[in-house]
């Protein structure tokens, strides 16, 4: 079964029916300018990728349509840094997110046709 939650070193991402929910500590949320519990709907998400920090730790990066793209990882409200051993889990989670986005886009296109 696919992983529907990732717990990182600076937050957590939950995969829900409505989109992704980012949970952060108070200080992490303030540093990113968001609430501690931050929801992003599927329609707002362009995709997700796995990146890495300069020290080699995996980072899940979620691209959101209306979000600025010039934020550094530590200030990006849609990025979660993980432990080094979690690269496989991050890759599976990103694949699940991207598959969900593609499925919803196909549904939207079929509904418009």
Go through the PLM ranges and name each one:
Residues 10-33:
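Short, compositionally biased strand/turn segments
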């Amino acid at each position: 079964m696919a992983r529907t939650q990732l717990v990182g070193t600076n937050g957590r991402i939950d995969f829900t029916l409505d989109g992704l929910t980012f949970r952060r500590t108070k200080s992490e949320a303030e540093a990113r300018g968001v609430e501690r519990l931050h929801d992003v709907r599927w329609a707002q998400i362009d995709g997700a990728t796995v990146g890495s920090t300069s020290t080699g730790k995996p980072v899940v990066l979620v691209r959101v349509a209306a979000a600025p793209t010039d934020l550094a990882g530590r200030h990006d409200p849609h990025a979660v840094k993980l432990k080094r051993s979690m690269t496989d889990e991050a890759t599976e989670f990103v694949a699940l997110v991207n598959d969900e986005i593609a499925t919803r886009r196909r549904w939207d296109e079929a509904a418009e046709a």
